[in-house]
Amino acid sequence: MRDALLGTSGVNVPLHLTNDRSPQALASVAQTDFGVTVNPNQIDPVALALLQRKLSNGQYFIPTPQTSDDALASTLGYDVLQQGPPSTFTANQANVNLDYKVSSKDHVSGKYYYQVAPTTNPFASVGGNSGGLPGFTHTLDAGSHTVSIDNSVNVSPNIVWEQRIGYIREKAFASTAQPFGPQEFGINLFGSPHFPGITIDNDGSSVSSLYSGSLQFGPVTNFANAGMFQDRYAGSSDLNWVRGRNNIAVGFNWDYLQLNIHNLNNQVAGLEFFDFPSFLTSSLRLGQEHSVLFNGITNRHYRASEAGMYAQDKIAVARNLNVSVGPRFDWDGPLSEKDGLLTNFDPSRYHYDLPTDTITNIGLVVAANNKALGTRGVGDSTLTPRQWGIAPRVGAAWTPASLNGKIVFRSGFGMFYDRGQFFTEFSPSAGFGFNGPFGVTLEPPFTVPVLATATSTFSNPFGTSPPPPPPTANLETVSSLIPNQAGLISGTTPLLFGGYDPRNKLPYSINWSFDMQWQAMEDLAFTIGYTGNHGVHLTEPIPFNQPNIATPQHPVNGQIYSYGYQPTDAAGGTLLSEQIQTSTGGNTDLRVPYIGFSPNSVFWTANAISNYNALQVGVNKRLKHGLLLNGSYTWSHSLDEQSGLGLFYNGNNPLNPRSSYASSDFDRTHVFTLQYLYELPQFTVDNSLLSKLENGWGLSGLMVFESGQPYNVYDFSGSVGSIYYSANDFITNPIVNLVPGQTQASAIQQGHPGATPPVPSLKPSAFAIPQLQPGQDGVPPCGPTTDGTTFCDTVENKFSAGGRNLFRGPFQARIDFSILKETKLTERIALKYTADFFNIFNHPSFDTPNNNVTFNPCFNPVPCYTFPPQGQLGLIQHTIGSPRFIQMSLHVLF
């Protein structure tokens, strides 16, 4: 498949950049578009070479804008539209089945399945058709092999023994091509052959009103040259024995996993510039999230084993009553790393001495199988609680004898354990350049960031000498990565850590059900029932180092006030009580429980709960008289604290996760589905041409009607929780609650679902941020400033209370319809024609409306709040599913 749309890229370049790429012309662009004076002699030779680089077609690699109309470019969001090769997707599949009868009592079957589906995109290294330049084609090589062998033996007339073994290999590796290497332009990356990912931002100084002047090229994401290869081996054995009224089943299973992560991002640097003039003059944007080269071991080889066994007895207590009972044992072995490249944080080991400002124990532990750094008393997985459990299961089915077998009552109860620890839960939160599923492979101490400095240049962004290996000879040297208070006050970035809480227990769920089925007719049955589920010890990302509230009565690490921002008075003076500005903001880094670790450090913690209750009604009509019918209706409610498996906590204060207990993100109150097939009767019964035309027709369809999904309102601009994270909250999705006095109903624009702009479904004025007043929750009281005035800090805010998934998106409906025609040509050959009408009435199903607002458009240490907030709140921007789509097919059956 070829997709020309994904082969396009909208690019932002300075509006007055021309084909004259002389230093004088480029300096003029800096002056005209940015108001910055650049001497032509100041232009860096690397930047000049990139701007003068031409493609094989004679066009410039960094293109000349196709319009100089500021208004048009602002409307489009770009001033150059590039057309590259089409994006391609290829899928190849093959399968083989083999059955062999060893004897009358022994049967062996084998299956093999192969699948490979590579994709290419000329601009996907920067996330699709947005901002990339040609030459850096992104390829995702994905595929799998699956093998299974099943052996079934009839040991005796009442004993059956079955054994299974299987193997699955999966791969998904992304790579980015490059038209040139760093050496060609004189960029010193210590021998790396990979061109760096380059980002040229627009910091707001552009004279143009074009919203985003960002230009990116090269492998600018952590997914540009990384992937995984997974091998899974499985085996099981089951024995069934029928003895009188008892049907006894026993068995066991075993599973072994090899997850190998290959990450080449320790060879790919990231370079970022504030704007085009900074790019010209080689002024790199500093900070780990901007200009960085990761140094160390970035491959991982994870291993895990699972095992289980069960025994179950299905007892025929009476002719109309069956009861099944039995326990199951599950052991979900935790992940380990083949070479011990696995670290964790143990809060009980950490120790900080406040009087001397010394971290005497950094709290990091390393897997025992690490020969150089293994921590005594720590296992290969670093987890401490048991990762196994015993799960009882009970079921019953009863048919009242007086009803002639027309009605059956069924019920069941069971516990089910599940793995809580996954590879993605080792990664830290966003914001420091090594987030995402592969972030753990770039996380200290086995990999450390090499940062650009004020003396860095485009030619030598990280100095002239290769960096030394990471300080992993012993944990004492690793402590150099974790700053004390003095270092934090001077601006040193704290260590961002992500991990799976070593104290976690194994998650499990308790399921129960009760239903009644009535066979009204031979081909018609009705079912009504109730089912429920309660999840325990579910995992959710919790920041273990969220700052505490410091007050004069309750100091924290010597701090007596709490502030995330550093607002100024009219003359630019700051409060004498707010003179610290740490990396995260204000004095946040000094109020944390563990000095030296980032407030955004996260543990995946197995403390969450969930509940699900549902009334289910169904009708099933087997095919008779040409009609087949299946219908179901579910009235349910799912509640939890955390619905997704992403890197962010969705709720209010993450240290009080129960405050975010609400409807699940995927909750659907009402769901109705109807599937049908009607075969038209035979009109003629002879073998004439007319008979072949008239007979064999059928109609089928699927109808789905369901409630919309829940949603709430977010603000990521630092307007919620600034007292903890300033504007640098990289771990939570901060919820904005209602203005006091407003209700869920009053916040909704009745009769306006949000699909007809400019009228939104929600009233922006109904929402407010939880601002704090001077003297409240540790905020300094009004007082003197550095310029002698009296000033008040009124810009601090806390987390909201409630508000998660308070609203619900539009109701959704979809009707699909098909016409079928089957014509027999001979006894063995037939033609089957289908005409499928997906969404036949072309009814739009609207997605949830936009729920992201901005109360702080400044997004900096001196916020500028606006009420009501900015953003397209309550306006629907997407639909779910496709418009009406018609397809026809013709099959030959033989």
Map each language-model feature to its residues.
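Membrane-embedded beta-strands that build the outer-membrane beta-barrel scaffold
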Residues: 1, 94-102, 106-114, 147-155, ...
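Flexible, surface-exposed loop regions and adjacent strand-edge segments
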Residues: 124-134, 178-199, 230, 255, ...
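Gram-negative outer-membrane beta-barrel proteins
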Residues: 116-122, 169-177, 245, 256-264, ...
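Solvent-exposed loop/turn elements at secondary-structure boundaries
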Residues: 176, 182, 194-199, 204-214, ...
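N-terminal, post-signal-peptide soluble/periplasmic segments
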Residues: 1-67, 171
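Extracellular loop and loop/strand-boundary signature of outer-membrane beta-barrel proteins
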Residues: 80-84, 132-137, 146, 150, ...
